[in-house]
Amino acid sequence: MAKGKERHMFPGGNTSKGFFSYYDFVLPQEKAKRILILKGGPGVGKSSFMKKIAAGLCGEGCDIEYMHCSSDPASFDGIVFPDKGVAIIDGTAPHIIDPKTPGAIDEIINLGQFWNDEGIIENRDKILATNQQTSELFQRAYRYIQAAYSIYKDNEVIYNKAMNHGKANVIISETVDRVFEGIGISEIEGKQRHLFASAITPEGLVNYLSSLITTQERIVLKGNPGTGTERLIERIRSAAIERGLYTESFYCALNPIRLEHLIIPELDVSITTSNEFHNADVKPTLEIDFNEFLDQDMLNKYKEETKFNRKEFETLLNRAIKTIQQAKEKHDELESFYVPNMNFSEVQKCQEEILKRL
């Protein structure tokens, strides 16, 4: 049997607004038949639990979506089997998830039942201290990211000022007409899904665009911050919703409310932003460079400012990444208090039982 299709993304991210969650869109309740919520402390085997179930079902030909952890991309915060309407999600901090439709859709799997309470209690003070240190490191990282974004925004203002928005509006209108040619307005609004394709992680900037931008039509947008690439994507999304089409929106790792990539599965169309921070390694069917509409004379007046901003942004972002690395090291230390006190043979039995049910 052929292996199922794999897609990779992030349900949450380390952003200028702190940890930002789109976990409600991992598998919306209206599409779900069963959502298993894993509970338990660090090191109890939640990610390994999901990996083994994913390997079992993917080998049987099931399509799968891997929801990576922005604080450790090698780990999973969730897996989704779209055709089955099934998801398994890590429901512990910082993305605490509780059942919304208990029994009918949602079910809690508590891996904490398989640990040795006495062994963990013995390390109580160390666990509390390490938890506190991890939290402090993440908060510091978020302050660095917020500072980096403030500088990034200054460049946005400069490029926006130099932009010929009239010419950009013409291109935006022409592209919307191209995507929706012959498709009328619907009486029913299209459904939406919101996630991240990229994240600021201990490994640096990581993106999974190559697993997502696989449609027949691939519109690639280029342009400096402030040139208006997001305006085009937002216009296309709005038009898709008006026509009753389902959309998948993927947001900026730095600013989690800024739209950067859009997929319209029913039209087999993707619109993706390509820049120095993330690039989809795909051959575009249409490429639009918004930098062509910039007033170069005006940019030359602010050359020193934009150069300074870019350098300081990179310095602060790299500092944030280093701090997230330190937080991961502390989290790994936290796991070391739980791993020796886990009965992993019982966890494996639980995993095998879940796999049979699915």
Per-range role (PLM):
Residues 22-24, 29-33, 41-42:
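Charged, compositionally biased non-catalytic regions
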Residues 38-39, 49-50, 65-68, 92, ...:
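A cross-family "folded-core" feature that marks the main globular domain of proteins
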Residues 353-355:
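Long, K/E/R/D-enriched contiguous segments that form extended
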Residues 126-179, 308, 312-351:
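An accessory alpha-helical subdomain
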Residues 1-27, 166-210:
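N-terminal pre-Walker A segment at the start of P-loop NTPase domains
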